[in-house]
């Protein structure tokens, strides 16, 4: 029997990029997967590929195509998961959660000809990319889905300390996300649950390609990264799954760089 049998990983943003890679990696390690994603008909074929890969690993998979930042949908997923795990006799077995929601406003602060960022843009970006981590964590704890031994991870970026054109609102949200991780790490210590941020290197994902300056970013990293390549989602997924073990109980409140040394060379 696998030591991971009966464990579940909740992946927010499970259909592409870091979320999809981490869902696949957890599945290969024997974890069951609950995925939350928001996709339209045009990208559902890619979602089905992720689901099929998880099933091929011989584990259970439940995907929800909803807005993870919607309170009603979140409550519904939590309730359905409580019922599912209770039926299986696996209460309290959501052992890991990855917050990998990449949806925010990419606009200049000062009108550059394409319009300036608005209060609604700021609010949406903060709610999706930072605050939703807290809401999901609250519900996991209060519902009893996650208990002692739980591991919470959230994807951050070097945008917390670098300026990228039109990335200001996301930089703000990622900085807040890291603050949320620190606060959760302290508050969850008495629950035996850890919380850490994962700072990936520049990765060629759909989210990156929405940034206007992404071609220059890719060129700069290819020239400067000590390994001579970009980070890929599997690099990050392997680290997250490796860390989701009892031996990392003393590792919490950190920002863990997974970038091949990219950030330290500028």
Question: What is the predicted function of each stretch?
Answer:
Residues 2-96, 103-120, 210:
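Short-chain dehydrogenase/reductase
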Residues 98, 153, 195-198, 208, ...:
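Hydrophobic structural elements of the Rossmann-like NAD(P)H-binding subdomain
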Residues 194-204, 244, 257-259:
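Conserved SDR Rossmann-fold cofactor-binding beta-strand/turn motif
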Residues 102-190, 202-203:
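Catalytic loop of short-chain dehydrogenase/reductase
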Residues 240-241, 252-266:
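Short C-terminal tail/terminal secondary-structure segment
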Residues 26, 188, 243:
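Aromatic pocket-lining residues of Rossmann-like dinucleotide-binding sites
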Residues 46-49, 166-169, 190, 202-225, ...:
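A glycine/serine/threonine-rich, flexible loop-to-helix segment
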Residues 225-236:
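A conserved structural motif in NAD(P)-dependent oxidoreductases
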């Amino acid at each position: 029997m696998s030591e991971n049998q009966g464990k579940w990983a909740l992946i927010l943003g499970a259909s592409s990029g870091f979320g999809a890679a981490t869902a696949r990696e957890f599945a290969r390690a024997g974890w069951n997967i609950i995925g939350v994603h928001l996709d339209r008909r045009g990208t559902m074929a890619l979602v089905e590929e992720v689901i099929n890969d998880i099933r091929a690993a011989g584990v259970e998979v439940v995907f929800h195509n909803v807005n993870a930042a919607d309170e009603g949908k979140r409550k519904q997923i939590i309730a359905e998961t409580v019922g599912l795990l209770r039926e299986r006799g696996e209460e309290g077995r959501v052992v890991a959660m990855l917050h990998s929601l990449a949806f925010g406003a990419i606009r200049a602060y000062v009108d550059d000809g394409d319009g300036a960022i608005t209060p609604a843009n700021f609010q949406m970006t903060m709610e999706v990319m930072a605050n939703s981590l807290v809401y999901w964590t609250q519900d996991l704890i209060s519902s009893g889905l996650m208990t002692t031994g739980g591991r919470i991870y959230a994807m951050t970026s070097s945008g917390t300390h670098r300026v990228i054109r039109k990335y200001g609102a996301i930089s703000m949200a990622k900085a807040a996300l890291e603050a949320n991780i620190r606060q959760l790490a302290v508050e969850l210590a008495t629950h035996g649950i850890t919380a850490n941020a994962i700072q990936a290197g520049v990765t060629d994902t759909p989210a990156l390609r929405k940034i206007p300056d992404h071609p220059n970013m890719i060129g700069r990293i290819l020239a400067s990264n000590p390994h001579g390549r970009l980070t890929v989602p599997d690099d990050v997924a392997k680290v997250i799954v490796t860390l989701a073990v009892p031996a990392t109980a003393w590792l919490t409140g950190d920002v863990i760089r997974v970038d091949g040394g990219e950030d330290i060379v500028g």
